[in-house]
Amino acid sequence: EAVANDNNWNQQIKQSVINAWSNAFDTGNYGPYNDVFPQVDWWDELVKPGFSQQYNVNISGGTNFMRYFASIGYQNDGDIYDLQKQENFDPRNYYRRYNWRSNLDFNLTKTTSLSVNIAGKMGYRNDNFADDVYTRIIAAPTNSFPIKYSDGYWGDGSTAGYNPVCNMNTNGSQLYKTFQGWYDVRLEQKLDFLT
């Protein structure tokens, strides 16, 4: 602090430290997993393009007596965070849905018809427990600590800032499962002969 108060900014960081960093950059001896010269672009390490997939298969047909329609579908909304499934839990955010529908229509007689409709969906949503991720990615220091040290321990964010990669991979997650099903049966009798 005294050096800063005296306006000796060139003495804030020792020349040997400046030279060491300069040499590290000149030789490429730095990076997100370098113990001595960490240089982490937290956004590039943690964020990737997201994706969404949707697939559907439909069949239909029939005769004068019976008509049918069946549909099955799958939707997968992937994660924008570059996370991998862990041994004990899955830190990735995603939503997966399976849906189905089946309609059967029968002409029992010229005036009587029967319809049976069945539909449903099953959903799986996985949410990461990490909070305020964007702010923490932007606020994390780029050269205070690596993502992980060479001994396998996470870069220490307790004194020099926050390690968002560690947080996203260790805070846990919750898997929500949902199921909804519908069915209806309709019998229709025309009563035109009464009028």
Task: Name the predicted role of every residue range.
Residues 1-34, 110-127:
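N-terminal, post-signal-peptide soluble/periplasmic segments
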Residues 191-195:
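Short, intrinsically disordered, charge-balanced linker/junction segments flanking boundaries
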Residues 85-90:
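Short glycine-enriched, charge-decorated loop/helix-capping segments at active-site entrances
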Residues 61, 184, 188-189:
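Alpha-helical support elements that line or immediately flank enzyme active sites
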Residues 33-73, 77-80, 91-163, 169-180:
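Flexible loop and strand-edge segments within Gram-negative outer membrane beta-barrel domains
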Residues 2-7, 142-143, 184:
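Short N-terminal signal/transit or membrane-insertion segments
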Residues 12, 24, 45-46, 157, ...:
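Enriched - but not universal
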